[in-house]
C-alpha cells in the first residue's frame, strides 16, 4: 500500500534526485524562473516552497537548513534578503508552475517554475 508516500522518483536514485532538485532550486533563486519537464517542475515547487518557508523565519537553524540545501551563502543571502520578504504576509504558494507545451525531441510536457510575486 502507498499510504502517506509522497514525492516523485523522477527516474533517479536518491542522491541524483536530491542533486537535481538542489540544482534546479539554485537556478530558480539566481534567475527567477526555470524551464523543465512537468514532473520535475512539480517537485521543484514543493522543494522551493519549503526553502522559502525556512528563509522567512530567519532563525539560525532554518537558515542553516537553507544553506544545507543551496550550498552557497550568496544564494542564501539573496533568498533571505530579497525573495523571502516578498512573501512575508503569504503562507505558502510562493512558486507558480506554468505549462508551456511539449518538448520537440521526445514530446515530454514542459513547464516554467517562477516566483508568484
Swiss-Prot record:
Protein origin, superkingdom: Bacteria
Cellular component aspect of the GO annotation: cytosolic large ribosomal subunit
InterPro entries assigned: Ribosomal_bL17 (IPR000456), Ribosomal_bL17_sf (IPR036373)
Presence of the UniProt keyword Transmembrane helix in the record: no
Ribosomal protein is among the record's keywords: yes
GO molecular function: structural constituent of ribosome
One of the GO BP terms on file: translation
SUPFAM superfamilies registered for this protein in UniProt: Prokaryotic ribosomal protein L17
Keywords: Ribonucleoprotein, Ribosomal protein
PANTHER family found in the cross-reference section: LARGE RIBOSOMAL SUBUNIT PROTEIN BL17M (PTHR14413:SF16), RIBOSOMAL PROTEIN L17 (PTHR14413)
NCBIfam families found in the cross-reference section: L17
Oligomer and partners: Part of the 50S ribosomal subunit. Contacts protein L32.
Family: Belongs to the bacterial ribosomal protein bL17 family.
The protein's name: Large ribosomal subunit protein bL17
Species in which this protein is naturally found: Coprothermobacter proteolyticus (strain ATCC 35245 / DSM 5265 / OCM 4 / BT)
